[in-house]
Amino acid sequence: METAQLLIDISKLTEGERIEMRKLGILTNDNELRDYKFPSIHAERPPIEKFAVHAPQVLNEAYNYQKPSSFSRALRLELGGYKILIVSGTASVNEEGKPEYIGDFKAQLWRTFRNLTNLLTAESMSWHDVVRTTCYLRDIERDYVEFNKIRTTFYNWLQLDPLPASTGIQVRLCWESLLVEIELYAIAKIN
């Protein structure tokens, strides 16, 4: 890997960063970038295959945004005849990576459900395959009642039974303009 590919300037690392990066094997004792070597344990046991999932009609990968982030929007794992979809926290963001419906919690929640639905559809899955959600609200005291009304309305419309397991948490989301974000896990048999 060339230094130019890094997002950090090695010459400006703190001593603590250098120590930890050496212990991780990223830097040599001379503070030079070490070439990455694939772990030998994977010669005997290959890592599980992971596939990035895309729904570009409604949102793009986070690393393609104007302010990029280093994570996949969603991953599909295949295990013993089942596929598992793991979706990162998803919010009311459009295909250009810009927040939609600033200040309108209810519209943001519906857009979030649309983005999640499109990610599920991209993998031939539906909300009936969802087993768990984690729901992040910027202001849980102000917005939870409306959140639960909309979520219940959506789930009832979908005729979900049983409902996915879920946890609700109040957090500061990545952008001040975002009021709600949801991550989910879905499991389905591979046809």
Segments from the language model and where they lie:
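N-terminal presequence-like segments and the immediate start of the first folded domain
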Residues: 1-114, 118-123, 128-131, 138-191
